[in-house]
Amino acid sequence: MEVLRYRSRPIVGGEAEGPAVVIDSLSFYGEVDPETGVTSGGKPLAGRVAAIRRSRGSTVGSYVIYALKENGVAPLAILMERAEPIVIAGCVLAGIPLYDGLPPEFFERVRDGYRVRVHSDGLVEVLGPGQP
């Protein structure tokens, strides 16, 4: 697989690289265990680049994101089509890199376990399955 490159908008800057976990829609409050970092669908967020197409839910979601970081089970970064204020506030509080503006194609092509590299300038590279 050739490296796929996408441009995104940095909201909370930082760099990250790791395996992707892909989620179409997520409410951090009620669908993510802040102690384990596992979603109600059984997907772990800890140590992964979370590609979450869209989010929804309560303002408590910001505190769940912060709790994930405090408990050592936060994602390395969060990539979204369009970040909402709840996720932005949570990532600012927790210092988790957050990028949005990724096109629908990104969420259609990236798969769980694909290695993703996020650069501070907003460049997102999908390196493919099992790439070091």
Swiss-Prot record:
Optimum pH is 7.0. It is an enzyme of class 4 (lyase). It catalyses: (R)-5-phosphomevalonate = (2E)-3-methyl-5-phosphooxypent-2-enoate + H2O. The keyword Lyase applies. Keywords: Isoprene biosynthesis, Lyase. One of its GO terms (biological process) is isopentenyl diphosphate biosynthetic process, mevalonate pathway. GO terms for molecular function: hydro-lyase activity. Thermostable. Treatment at 90 degrees Celsius causes a loss of most activity, and treatment at 100 degrees Celsius results in complete inactivation. Pathway: Isoprenoid biosynthesis; isopentenyl diphosphate biosynthesis via mevalonate pathway. The active site is at S58 (proton acceptor). It holds the Pfam family AcnX_swivel_put. The keyword Lyase applies. SUPFAM superfamilies: LeuD/IlvD-like (SSF52016). Its EC number is 4.2.1.182. Neither the addition of 1 mM Mg(2+) nor 1 mM Mn(2+) has a significant effect on the activity, whereas Zn(2+) causes almost complete inactivation. Strongly inhibited by H(2)O(2), but not by EDTA or iodoacetamide. Belongs to the AcnX type II small subunit family. Component of a hydro-lyase that catalyzes the dehydration of mevalonate 5-phosphate (MVA5P) to form trans-anhydromevalonate 5-phosphate (tAHMP). Involved in the archaeal mevalonate (MVA) pathway, which provides fundamental precursors for isoprenoid biosynthesis, such as isopentenyl diphosphate (IPP) and dimethylallyl diphosphate (DMAPP). Heterodimer composed of a large subunit (PMDh-L) and a small subunit (PMDh-S). HAMAP family: PMDh_S. This is Phosphomevalonate dehydratase small subunit. It comes from Aeropyrum pernix (strain ATCC 700893 / DSM 11879 / JCM 9820 / NBRC 100138 / K1).
